[in-house]
Amino acid sequence: LWSSTQTPSELKDGIHEAFDIPQSKIKVVGLPSGSSFGQWWSNNFHMLTVCLARKAGRPVKIELDNEECMSTVKRRHLERSVGRMGCTDDGDLTFLEVDHVIDNGAYGFKDDVGFTAHDMWHPIDHANITIRGINTNKVTAGCMRGVGDCTISVAIERMADQLAEKVGMDPLKFRLKNQVKSGDAIAREGLADLPQGSVEAYLASIPESLRDAWPDPLRLSSGSTHELLRRGAKQFNFKKKWNGWGRPYKIDGSKHRAVGVGTGAHTCGVEFEGPTSALVRIHRDGSAKLYCSVGRQGQGSETTQAQVAAEALGFPLEMVEVETGDTDACPWSHGSIASNTMYRTGWATYEAAKDARRQLLELSLIHI
């Protein structure tokens, strides 16, 4: 199957599961997709193509224009957040409650998105985050860039602003007072009603023998928003321009200019079906070839992966070639979804290149 897909390996898995064809008889060649925003994963038209080709016994091609893509493949989830947030008179958060509903359309299945958005805020004694996926008679929804994180983050940020205004605190000070800092424990206790197939259910299913190696409690090792907030506020001169809630710092006719502060969280590096892998091969002329199954949406994944491999090998960049789409050559990978390309495939590439360098040096010692 030749297809403009972000996930060659997962598409191969999907064909195997749908038609019970041995994976040894399936080959997917991933082609450039252009901008996708998550559309070019494993989709219905992929399976229709395989089904028609098997029935006809002939090659089959399905081609969709932009309008057909938008109306038949999938769309962004429609989401609604309703919540409450409370604090003491001096601005210390006391409780957070969010009820988040996701419209999955006819056949969508998301019910676990945005579950880390509340981790931006310091662990609260009383918190309840409920996320529900529902099916409706609309076009099936699917993952499109920042699934759930954006919506829940905006809802929580809006509540934080309203709360800060009520206690007479500016948005910067309120966030510096309440957001998680490096070294703080991230609360993960009290998980309940985990939907089958959800991220949380996956985490809960991990054996205790593996969990023993995890830090307890789980702490934020880096990435505190405090320094970012201070630097950002300084960049646009927040102290000078902040004039109070609802009061602009400049009025020019009908234009009212004001400033605000906000933060957001996004989850990347998700792992469901298995670990991501990469392979580096050293050729007799001293050049190298990297095999990694990633998507090509115009983000330059071939270049970035080649740069990682070249640096780890100690080779010039022009001596490293990259194969990204052929599942017969490339080991299994999640592909380019959920901000995975550099975070996960990049690490796999780095480790594969380091291992190739180690083997090369060991062989050179034998011949010295």
Residue ranges and their predicted role:
Residues 1-365:
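Structural alpha/beta core scaffold segments of enzyme domains
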